């Protein structure tokens, strides 16, 4: 049964007379406490925060003196007391509440400045189970939620970045806060505790290998408010989930303006793709536009890999995102600045390369500090009307699969390498996806078509266009391997690839008409392998 409100009007201005400060992150807390003290505010605090305030020479009352009860159980119990929560939750204009405060000696608390145990940091660093559990804050969220609920009278601050706004308000208005400010801080407080609990609940799900928990919470902290979303009429923000996976969310912007919504989406797609190619094996470059690759290649050098990737579709690469699996060097930078590019992301960047990229001040340059592990577990989420689709990350690797030769002719060693190369890329192309590859270089990419035949034909046409632009006698699809991210439901898609010049095929298999497709491959002396793993991407 719902609780009925007494509907007592909230005051606009509330004078801050007593403040409770209890923080794990002590950034600027002494400066804030100093301002509060000068305004005549009585300071209450706990543990390490109280010690820091006292050492700064400020008068502070330990919460244990308010509760008349010591901290116990290694600090697990210190603020969970009626004298604290009564002071936070009391409705100051309710006669019954005021009488209860007098009867039990409860002092009103007008301001709570609280941040939480660093559970996210401990989890990210891979702390052991007991240590991680010990860093689940109990008293902090309880006080935050109590303060936020009673924002009609209590100001709650959970983020050091909000201290300046609080100080400005207090100094401008004789130590008072407005209802609008208290309401805004309360909304942020509930968002903070929700995100905190989301990380905890997801950690438990991972620890217990619960793939589909009954409740799924996804939380994040705003990294930046964006100018707009996918289109100018859409609002957008970029949130960090706390996952320490190298990529666009954790990368350092070395130069260039703020990334747009579409830049972030494309950069993530590009970097996840190029990470499929281990840097110790060969330099690799991926060029992405609208979250689909328009060219991918390996090479003896990073610069050569870039040139080979660009050759696949230099027209579509204009205004694209370039991802590298090795440190960006000067030679590669000189090649990249020849063409208009939106974003470059690499594990690192040499000083010489930075100087070269600086010639293009609007070109965004990101250093990610490493490559994401393509085999690592994780989650992806997508909203639908009234719901949320959550699935495990597609971390299947072709190197880990048992490839089954299903045709009379087995692939040559080079064909097999090209098959694997193409199948890695197919995983990152919107379905239906068809990729032609030869000698570690994409020859043509067909993406996002409703018909697999159309994807094969588009990829072949792209290859012909590239051949003409490069002055080649024939497209690179001649003698290429072709990859399909899902099975061929009919032989027509395979025949389209064969018509383009493919001599080897890699696909998951699993169609009711697999034998028809195998027969067509045998008829044209084409080698084909089944992976047994599909890579739909929508």
UniProtKB/Swiss-Prot annotation:
Pathway: Purine metabolism; IMP biosynthesis via de novo pathway; 5-formamido-1-(5-phospho-D-ribosyl)imidazole-4-carboxamide from 5-amino-1-(5-phospho-D-ribosyl)imidazole-4-carboxamide (10-formyl THF route): step 1/1; Purine metabolism; IMP biosynthesis via de novo pathway; IMP from 5-formamido-1-(5-phospho-D-ribosyl)imidazole-4-carboxamide: step 1/1. Signal peptide: none annotated. GO terms for molecular function: IMP cyclohydrolase activity; phosphoribosylaminoimidazolecarboxamide formyltransferase activity. PROSITE patterns: MGS (PS51855). Its EC number is 2.1.2.3, 3.5.4.10. Keywords: Hydrolase, Multifunctional enzyme, Purine biosynthesis, Transferase. One of its GO terms (biological process) is 'de novo' IMP biosynthetic process. Residues 8-158 form the MGS-like domain. One of its GO terms (cellular component) is cytosol. It catalyses: (6R)-10-formyltetrahydrofolate + 5-amino-1-(5-phospho-beta-D-ribosyl)imidazole-4-carboxamide = 5-formamido-1-(5-phospho-D-ribosyl)imidazole-4-carboxamide + (6S)-5,6,7,8-tetrahydrofolate; IMP + H2O = 5-formamido-1-(5-phospho-D-ribosyl)imidazole-4-carboxamide. InterPro entries: AICAR_Tfase_dup_dom_sf, Cytidine_deaminase-like, MGS-like_dom, MGS-like_dom_sf, PurH-like. The IMP cyclohydrolase activity resides in the N-terminal region. Belongs to the PurH family. PANTHER family: BIFUNCTIONAL PURINE BIOSYNTHESIS PROTEIN ATIC (PTHR11692:SF0), BIFUNCTIONAL PURINE BIOSYNTHESIS PROTEIN PURH (PTHR11692). This is Bifunctional purine biosynthesis protein PurH. It comes from Agrobacterium fabrum (strain C58 / ATCC 33970).
């Amino acid at each position: 049964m719902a609780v009925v409100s007494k509907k007592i009007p909230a005051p606009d201005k509330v004078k801050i007379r007593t403040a409770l400060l209890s923080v794990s992150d002590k950034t600027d807390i002494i400066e804030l406490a100093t301002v509060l003290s000068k305004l005549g505010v009585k300071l209450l605090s706990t543990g390490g925060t109280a010690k820091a305030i006292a050492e700064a020479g400020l008068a502070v009352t330990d919460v244990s003196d308010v509760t008349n009860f010591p901290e116990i159980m290694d600090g697990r119990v210190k603020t969970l007391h009626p004298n604290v929560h009564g002071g936070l939750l009391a409705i100051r204009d309710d006669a019954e509440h005021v009488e209860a405060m007098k009867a039990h000696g409860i002092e009103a608390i007008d301001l709570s400045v609280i941040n939480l145990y660093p559970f996210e940091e401990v989890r990210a660093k891979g702390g052991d189970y007991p240590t991680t559990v010990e860093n689940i804050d109990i008293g902090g969220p309880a006080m935050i939620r109590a303060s936020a609920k009673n924002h009609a009278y209590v100001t709650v601050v959970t983020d050091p970045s909000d201290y300046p706004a609080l100080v400005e308000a207090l100094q401008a208005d004789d130590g008072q806060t407005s209802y609008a400010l208290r309401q805004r801080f309360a909304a942020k407080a509930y968002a903070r505790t929700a995100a905190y609990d989301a990380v905890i609940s997801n950690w438990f799900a991972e620890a217990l290998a619960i793939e589909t928990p009954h409740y799924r919470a996804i939380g994040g902290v705003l990294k930046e408010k964006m100018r707009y979303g996918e289109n100018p009429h859409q609002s957008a923000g970029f949130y960090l989930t706390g996952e320490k996976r190298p990529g666009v969310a954790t990368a350092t912007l070395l130069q260039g303006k703020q990334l747009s919504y579409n830049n972030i989406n494309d950069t993530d797609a590009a970097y996840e793709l190029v990470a499929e190619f281990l840097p110790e094996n060969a330099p690799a470059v991926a060029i992405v536009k609208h979250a689909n690759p328009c060219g991918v290649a390996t090479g003896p050098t990073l610069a050569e890999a870039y040139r080979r990737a660009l050759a696949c579709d230099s027209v579509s690469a204009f205004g694209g995102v370039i991802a590298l699996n090795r440190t960006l060097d000067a030679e590669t930078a000189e090649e990249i600045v020849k063409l208009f590019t939106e974003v470059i992301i690499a594990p690192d960047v040499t000083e010489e390369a930075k100087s070269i990229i600086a010639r293009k001040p609007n070109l965004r340059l990101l250093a990610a500090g490493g490559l994401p592990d393509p085999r690592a577990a994780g989650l992806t989420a997508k909203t639908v009307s009234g719901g949320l689709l959550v699935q495990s990350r597609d971390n299947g690797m072709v190197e880990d699969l048992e490839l089954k030769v299903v045709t009379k002719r087995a692939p040559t060693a080079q064909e097999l390498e090209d098959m694997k190369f193409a199948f890695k890329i197919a995983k990152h192309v919107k379905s239906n996806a068809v990729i032609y590859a030869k000698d570690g270089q994409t020859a043509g990419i067909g993406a996002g078509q409703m018909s697999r035949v159309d994807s094969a034909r588009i990829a072949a046409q792209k290859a012909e266009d590239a051949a003409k632009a490069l002055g080649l006698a024939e497209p690179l699809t001649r003698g290429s391997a072709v990859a399909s991210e899902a099975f061929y439901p009919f032989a027509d898609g395979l025949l389209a690839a064969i018509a383009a010049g493919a001599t080897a095929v890699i696909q998951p298999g699993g169609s009711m008409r697999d034998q028809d497709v195998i027969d067509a491959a045998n008829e044209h002396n084409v080698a084909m392998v089944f992976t047994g793993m599909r890579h739909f991407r929508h």
